């Protein structure tokens, strides 16, 4: 098989699922009012309010970086400090976007086992942070759910972290690019890992889980909404034909495809993790698998036609494998067999 047929690079390499494409086609009939005043965008608040079991305000954007950076810019002034894990997407893969859109806010990066922050680490960092006119002012905590290392925060974890943040006056943001995978793993109501646990705003991802290009910024704290609306427009992320993004998000939720795709990718990742055995680096709780193979064994996998990203220190021969919603079962079985043979 060609390398493209055995790709485990990223869930971003996957296709858009039929339910999403059908929704776009349905929205592509006739005229609709522009800039979010269409009927599809008009339904987002109600649909997501039902999903989260509380009244929310939701805004469609096309990329996860826009969702994260504009959310954090809403939470932090230019002189603000945003506390996040050192492996977080906003720290490693967004080209300084939070600082750019906020006008200067800086990330304060913290360690944490398996990609997760602990309330003890956050509390210690906040306690050590000097507060006076000469320093950045603590403004926000950003968590990633599921994390960049394929692990998941439990509801109690988020509750403790949010409580520590709120006690110091910080708002709480969650990067939920793989939020569906976290929900599928926890099998809990969406509310339990968002507003009930103290989250103020969520970047609700769909693109990695079968959408074409669709993310929603979901506000549980409605006082933040007006500022965000203006920031989104000023940043060029208020789409004139918003109906096509909103239609994806509605289909993603209303058809239940979010759950179906996430459960499948989680299951495939679990299979890969079991095959990796002792080489596994982190618990497999979402759709990402990290293994430490050594340089020679990693190259042997690549020579066998498997596509994946190198990860971590080059000398350790680490690799990341990501399951997509449309991965053929036989490709996953082939990877599992190859890992077991190493």
What kind of region is each of these model predictions?
Residues 2-304, 310-326, 330-331, 335-342:
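Conserved PLP-enzyme active-site core in the AAT-like
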